[in-house]
Amino acid sequence: MVKLESLKKSYQFKKALKERKIHTDYFSIFASKNFFKPKYKSNLLISFVMKKKIGNAVKRNKIRRKLKANVQKLLKKKGAINRDYTYIVFGKSNAYTQKQDVLLPLMEKSFSKLKK
């Protein structure tokens, strides 16, 4: 089983934000080649970030949970997410009202674009 490992240091975020990016109405995904090793080889380096302007903590956490659940579903599909990359997913306020079923194909399409 693949576990999600979060980025911890600011230099990790800065490096990941400089490379590839994809924007949608519900989230933005930033990706860069793995520049440091995850704790375990099977882990995926990914962080979920929300702006404080989105709303209170309940709203931000709900968006984070939706996006994280979609990533978990995509990890079960073979080859949907490349584990050789470090990802940062910025949630947007539109994702709060949107159903998870709508977000999943968008996220899958975004991750496939980042592979190219």
Question: Where do the model's predicted regions map?
Answer:
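Positively charged, solvent-exposed patches that mediate nucleic-acid binding
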Residues: 1-116
